[in-house]
Amino acid sequence: MENLYQEQESNYKTLFSMAMSTKKLFLVFFLALVMSPVFPAQVDDMMIRDHLRKIYQITGMSIPEKDSPEYPKILFVDQDFIEQMACKGEACDAPAFTKGPTVFMADDLDLEEILGESILYHELVHVLQYYNYGRNDGCKSWSKRELQAYQLQEEFVNERGYDMPWLRSVTHYLAAMCDRWHK
């Protein structure tokens, strides 16, 4: 029980630092109080490192050191939290989002299934994009990064013998998504 309390306290510290960087302090604290607990994902660190190395091999984006504050942190959250933070409170289909080095994943995703693991891979692309290039500076930057993340996710899925046609079609909607979420 002590360990669970420490993990949850660490998660609230992550939420607090995110709030300070986005100036959404009230919203984040409100969500932290009313949402279901945030739990660190039980993700094998070797999986994360393997994915980061693969992304590096393809893109050349450098990887933060494991003990760096920029090294990825994976947290499971409920869908309401994702909708509040990634979709400005509107209902959306986003199963995850990334803020700096922190990946927030819907708590119903299974990382042992190809969909869940490929979404983690997609979000790790965003972690490395942030680490290498900083924040998005607008819709054009956001669209380019999303396009790269979806293309790498599709390669990841295909290499494992799966096909997810929606990965190819979603890139056609990036401009509309940009207008909706990144005004």
Label every model-predicted segment.
Residues 1-19, 161:
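N-terminal amphipathic/basic-hydrophobic helices that include classical n-h-c signal peptides
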Residues 18-26:
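Bacterial N-terminal signal peptides that target proteins for export
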Residues 28-34:
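Bacterial N-terminal signal peptides
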Residues 41-103, 110-113:
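Auxiliary, metal-adjacent structural segments of Zn-dependent hydrolase domains
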Residues 106-110, 136-142:
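Second-shell loop/turn segments in exported
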Residues 113-128:
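Short alpha-helix carrying the canonical HExxH Zn2+-binding catalytic motif
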Residues 124-140:
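Catalytic Zn2+-binding segment of zinc metalloproteases
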Residues 139-172:
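Post-HExxH zinc-binding segment in Zn-dependent metallohydrolases
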